Every structure is written in C-alpha cells, then in structure tokens.
C-alpha cells in the first residue's frame, strides 16, 4: 500500500525480490528438473568401451533443416571420423527453401593439397549421409587453419555463425580467445 509523502510505514521492495525468486525457480527448473536429484549440464555424452566419458556437445545445438531437427554433435562426430579431419564445427545458415542449410568449418590433421579438397568434401558428405542420412549433408564446407576457442577449449560457434552470415562487424571481443588470430584467417578464407 502506498502511504504517500511524510507517512511512516514498512518498506517492501517487490521487484527485486520477485526477480530473485524467478531466477531461483528458473534455475531449478532448467538444471534440476530433467533428472531427479541430478544436475543437468545441457551437454550430451557417451561412455566408450574403456569406460571413459566423452562430451559430445550441447544437446540444444539443433539446426532445423527442411523441418528436420538436426543436432550438430552427431554430424560433427561423423565428420571427425574421417581419417584426415582433426576437428569440425557446424553452424546453420539461412536458406530460402530449406529454412537453414548446414555450413561446416573443418580443420584437417595435415594441410592437404588444395586439389584434394573436393574429394575430401565428397568423402565427408558420404560419411554423414551413411551415418545420419542425406538430409544432414553439408551445403558448404570450408577447410580452416583452426577453430576459435575459449581458454577452456570450447569452440566459439557464435563467432563462426557470424562469419558464415557475413556479419563480421559484430563479432564482439575476440582478444580473450585462446587463438584470436585464427578468426582473421577464417574471415580471409571465407569472405575472399
């Protein structure tokens, strides 16, 4: 109740308190409701034959292509099985017909002759098609010298997405990356 000016009353700050309560409820709902008494990180994982756990990526990294929800982690896992591939990252790019198309940034173990790039691209899409299905084949593949990563090793997909969308003016601060120089190299390759 508002008492107006010059009246003694009790103070209650609803907006601050309500935000705290909502944040706590949202936090519990997001991280503790998926599995009883367990914290859900949002990461996918599997256990290999040696008992080791491998984090496969965010389960919410999903790109909708022609009405199909495609997770980036399984596609990247298929790509990374290629003998010449060191690592990969997939982002979605708007497409007139499909809604989104798949854009792959791929780092090779050894710098191959650029004449073999087309063969490697075909091999990669065959692997994806065989393991996941033809809908998951990449529309664009770019071989890059490295992927932008945080100091903890997380691939900065946000930056890769912006480069793929030709939005390089809004990359944000890249100086804190483990390898900030790779961003310029990727931009030079992609937007040449």
Which residue stretches match the model-derived regions?
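Acidic/polar alpha-helix N-cap and adjacent early helical turns
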Residues: 163-192
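General small-molecule cofactor/ligand-binding pocket signal
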Residues: 91, 141-144
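Conserved ATP/PPi-binding loop(s) of AMP-dependent carboxylate-activating enzymes
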Residues: 1-36, 70-72, 168
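Short clusters of hydrophobic/aromatic residues that line enzyme substrate/ligand-binding pockets
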Residues: 21, 27, 31, 63, ...
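Short coil/turn motifs at secondary-structure junctions
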Residues: 12, 109-111, 146
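AMP-binding/adenylate-forming catalytic core of the ANL superfamily
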Residues: 2, 7, 34-37, 42-136, ...
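Active-site and channel-lining beta-strand-loop segments
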Residues: 43, 144-150
């Amino acid at each position: 109740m508002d008492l107006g000016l010059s009246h003694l009353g009790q103070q209650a700050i609803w907006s601050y308190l309500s935000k705290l309560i909502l944040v706590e409820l949202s936090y519990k709902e997001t991280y503790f409701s998926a599995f009883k008494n367990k914290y859900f990180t949002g990461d996918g994982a599997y256990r290999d034959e040696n008992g080791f756990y491998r984090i496969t990526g965010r389960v919410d990294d999903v790109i909708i292509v022609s009405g199909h929800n495609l997770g980036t982690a399984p596609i990247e896992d298929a790509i990374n099985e290629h003998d010449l591939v060191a690592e990969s990252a997939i982002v979605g790019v708007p497409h007139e017909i499909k809604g989104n198309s798949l854009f792959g940034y791929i780092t090779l173990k050894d710098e191959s002759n650029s004449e073999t790039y087309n063969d490697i691209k075909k091999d990669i899409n065959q692997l994806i098609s065989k393991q996941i299905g033809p809908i998951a084949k990449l529309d664009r593949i770019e071989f890059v010298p490295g992927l932008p990563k945080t100091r903890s090793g997380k691939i900065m997909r946000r930056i890769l997405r912006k480069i793929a969308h030709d939005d390089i003016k809004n990359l944000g601060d890249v100086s804190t990356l483990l390898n900030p120089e790779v961003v310029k190299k990727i931009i030079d390759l992609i937007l040449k």
